[in-house]
Amino acid sequence: MPRTIWSGAISFGLVTVPIHVVSATEDHSVRFHQYHLEDMGRVRVRKYCELEDREVTQDEIGKGYELSKDTVIPVLDEELRELPLPTAKAIEIEAFVPLASIDPMGIGEGYYLQPDGQVAAKPYKLLRQALERSSKVAVAKYAWSGRERLGMLRVREEAIVLHAMRWPDEIRDPSELAPQGIELSEDEITEAEQLIDRLTRDDLEGEEFQDHYTEALHEVIEAKQEGHAPPEARETEEEPGKVLDLMAALRQSVAKAKASRGESGEADVHELPRKKTAARKTAKQQPAKKTSAKRTAAKEPTKKTAAKKTTPKKPRRSA
């Protein structure tokens, strides 16, 4: 299992379940670094004090709230840890609700909750089975990374999953995005429903649900590593054009979906062809000799002062 992100407890009425929080997902994206193109030297970001114009270490860095342009209120990590919040040390379950009552827009990253030792095993299993039988999810509050957060607990196989959630006031109203003055015929809606039926799947298994972008990136990197030109873009069956007749486009889409199933009507539905952009050929570049550059002195800014006692201004919720 991955490393522990946070340790605490689930508070479930008078029941406490000690847990470890671990990541539930993995990122397989290809990661690039930034390089100076002239000599391929690695470009790095360093932390500088704008008043002293020098690089500072992590031990010299702390948090502060900018009250005004020239006044900063320092906030210590110890002060944040001692905030009088029950959620600072535990995931406090506030309510149980049907999953359908939660807007998916507010559901974020998922984490596995792992019982902390044999003592926590029984109450952990109790909560997991109770959630499963009730067909509900738990809504909880917890404090991470300098702010109180909303979370959702649900069952996934034999584990309890914590999903980070957004507060209701953090979700924007989409009403202004809806097109105005548009009318649809019943035939158009029926054709769209037929297309949905033809493209309906029981799961996300299949070649069309693989990460082809990452696969293509690996092909480019491997080709350049061997001194070859990057592979050419594969030819597509056709390129989609502008939709001039919505009804005709819907009928054509339904026909293609039917054809992709085969004569029996039971074959898998494949994704319609997408337009692909051709990869540019680039010559293999030899790294140049790394050279060091002198740092240019920065203009000395106006000095900020730490506030001693000022009229408090209510800060916004931190990110």
UniProtKB/Swiss-Prot annotation:
Keyword DNA repair set for record: yes
InterPro entries: Ku70/Ku80_beta-barrel_dom, Prok_Ku, SPOC-like_C_dom_sf
GO biological process: DNA recombination; double-strand break repair via nonhomologous end joining
SUPFAM superfamilies according to UniProt: SPOC domain-like
Keywords: DNA damage, DNA recombination, DNA repair, DNA-binding
Biased composition regions of type Basic and acidic residues, renumbered to the chain: 260-274
Domain Ku per the UniProt entry, residue ranges: 10-188
A GO molecular-function descriptor: double-stranded DNA binding
Function in brief: With LigD forms a non-homologous end joining (NHEJ) DNA repair enzyme, which repairs dsDNA breaks with reduced fidelity. Binds linear dsDNA with 5'- and 3'- overhangs but not closed circular dsDNA nor ssDNA. Recruits and stimulates the ligase activity of LigD.
Subunit structure: Homodimer. Interacts with LigD.
Entries under NCBIfam families matching the protein: Ku_bact
Protein name as annotated: Non-homologous end joining protein Ku
Species assigned in the record: Streptomyces avermitilis (strain ATCC 31267 / DSM 46492 / JCM 5070 / NBRC 14893 / NCIMB 12804 / NRRL 8165 / MA-4680)
Gene designation per UniProt: ku
